[in-house]
Each structure stands twice: as C-alpha cells, then as structure tokens.
C-alpha cells in the first residue's frame, strides 16, 4: 500500500510538474478553475444554487471548455509559440471572466456578444463608475498570471523543448469533450431542456459555465444576424396573414 502511494506520488509530480508542458497547462487550468469559483461565489452570489447537485455542477463546469481550449494549444510544437499561446489564452479567459464580474456588479447580468462588440459605447456610459465597481478580490483574478509570467521570465518555470505528443494532445481534447458531455448530462438531469428553452442567463452560467455561455450566446447571435440579413420585405405579408388567420376574438364576458 505504501509503495503504491509512493509510486502514485512520483507519477503525480512528474505529470503535473510545471516544468513540462502538460504540467504547465494543468497549472493554468487549475488556477483558472479557482478564479472561476471565486467569481461564482463572491461576485455572482452563488448563482442561486440551492441543492448539492447544483453546487457539484458549478464546481466542475469550468473544466470542460478550459481543457478543450488548452488542449488545442498543446498541438503547437515550437517552444516559444506554445507558451505564448497558452498565456494569451489564459489572459483572454481571465479578461472574459473579469468583464462579466464588473457587469454583474453593475447590472446583475452577464456580458453578451453584442455588448462586447459595442464595448466602447458601454465604457463611455459607465465612465468613472468602472473604477468604483472594483473589489478587493479583483487582485486574485490576475495574480496567478503575473506570478507565472515572472517565473517564466526568471526561469523558475523552465520552458520544455520537447513538444506534447499528438497522441497526448488528442487524449486531452477527448477528455475535455467527454467532460463537456458529462456536464451536459448532469445539467439536463437537473434542468431539462436547458439548451432548447429560453432560460435566464444565470441558469446557463450555473449549469454550463461562463465560457460555455459566451460560446452559446455567440452561436445564437450569428444565427439571428443571418436570419436578419436573409429577411425580405415581402416576408412581413406572411406574418400578417398568419396573425390574421389565427386571430382570437376578445371574450365578450370580460370585454
């Protein structure tokens, strides 16, 4: 038993050692997972979770998209582009999380893709209010990135020359996809038809995570824009005909 534990400990240190590429990606993943939970409970007010299943889903839902995204960076063979890409991905994910924290503090809502596209107008509207919306925990959203970058620069975390094998990259990507389907299964058990019915955005974030919510909102935005661009002036006649044929007269008992 002791020998088995010792071997497992050695395997863990080797696998999750930040001085190799796989360990470095896991380090970024775990830190971002911790930041996401910090946002869930401090900035998003627990997202209305009311039972152990919902809390469990909230705890695991950040992993799927993160594993998928970081696994994509593992296909990069060259040393410097790999580490730069991984850090940039982490910065973008952290920025997305932080912007949603600021938005939720001000408007109790999450940032949609349309709002991101019109960020300059929103920022002008907020003005100096953006600074007043900052909180003490904001420091922790960026701390890991600063520390990891410094450790890379001073070579306390060494950049590994040997690339991640294609087999391991595909394995990591498959693990992320499997985690996503598992998350979807649990979410559907707790809240049936989550993706097909028009629930509040809070439900989507609570069950699937902030990253999945943003992707889902982006897909919906593209579909709506495509429908708008393909709409023709004579389409309104079909709408009017449908409304006219399905018109229900007012009940004389009440009107």
What are these regions (language model features)?
Residues 2-224:
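Transmembrane and membrane-interface helices of multi-pass
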